[in-house]
């Protein structure tokens, strides 16, 4: 593979930095036909240096006529406006609601001139308001469109994952600019397109627009703004025939920075889930299978004439655990693997601190941006299941901080109480809380960063044990017991429920069900939090000062022959060969042992 010309690097990196140093996130979408158990799955890493990891919770509510909802910018907390409330809002838990609708996002910026300077609904508010108002993915798309067009869109170009228990969509949108006449923005609203992910396929996006050409007469699978093409023509972004129009080329054109820093993460997710072979349908509808390496020059930003397919078909059915593990990727085993150069230090650290670029020897260079990253606020796998009642079907697998050293725990979306470790207000970025998940996960991740190749595998073993037990055994047992309770209620109230199934049936008859899953959710989250507090103490004792103290099978520490307060022989793992060779080369004359 060739290296990009230095001039290209210099110019493109200036575009890379603003996009990646704000909110840079990653989503993977798994349709129910592509998942191992028939679930719809959506992952989300909410990555930001300014986001505290906590679980947003809003119970269902009925609202009187004239009620208003205050809208605040999700990123900054700035007050934007107030809007009319609807008669009934669904319960929301994080980025899911009680009807098993999931909405997540990644921001790609796009053309600066399309910002609506008078917009009053930001992208975060669109997500959480739509979750309160929509019972299906298609309804959510319409809610988002209606809100943005009525109140004006206050954010940059955005990609949403929008899914429910039956289907999944990728939606992209951006404003139309600011043109004030008589105090009114004549360009208020959004241009947008939404495409249904074919059942059996998967999709991913990571801060770069993904939708290219799209079908103009297939409303079952593609929805779009009537003026999505005409606005591009008016702005001079496009002048070809309608059927050749590409949303991403018009509104979010790629450059080195957006590809290397963003689409490379999509490539990596596809590479993992496809087993290294991308199977997809091309623009002519032909089945194609190509080696993932065929797309690597594009993913690394070397050949911007390339592209990635929007959808691919995985090598095998994808489990919740498998897609959660994708969120822990650091480009291992690829040319972008950060452990393979001296930037990884002496312990193969797969992270690079910000900023995203640096200057050396007259050139500008980048720090890689992998899926797993240090500045994650919270991350999740949303699981929606059409074969289980809504009171049991939705599970938000939720975690905080860096996905590579943190776990996700099951949060049923019908809960009536949030675990204290995830509770809003339990700490923030400037105030430490010993009872907050975000802070204990940061203590563990930051401990691992100092001796990563030695400590992180120890943590990963605990993560895998917990998640495997929950995903493959324990939640199945909870589901079964909860469904028994649900069926008992249905048998008693069948006539009443059947007559109101499509209306707003009170959830009170299912209180036993929701109490059961709430108890399990809270107990599991708090017990695992306590286990992580103990793990952080164990890491300190075990790996203090670069030593590795041996442990027994039960986790206790081995002690010396003479006293229980002194460890048995400690190990000194030292540094990687790469580090030793580099230090010897750079400082050998000073450090070399003389014979």
Regions found by a protein language model. Name each.
Residues 25-123, 143-313:
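A contiguous strand-loop segment
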Residues 9-19:
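Bacterial N-terminal signal peptides
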Residues 463-595:
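Histidine-centered catalytic/metal-binding microenvironments
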Residues 340-483:
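Substrate-recognition/cap regions that form aromatic- and gly/pro-loop-enriched pockets
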Residues 1-9:
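Bacterial N-terminal signal peptides that target proteins for export
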Residues 115-117, 125-134:
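Second-shell loop/turn segments in exported
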Residues 276-359, 369-371, 480:
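Accessory, solvent-exposed terminal regions and/or long lumenal/extracellular loops of proteins
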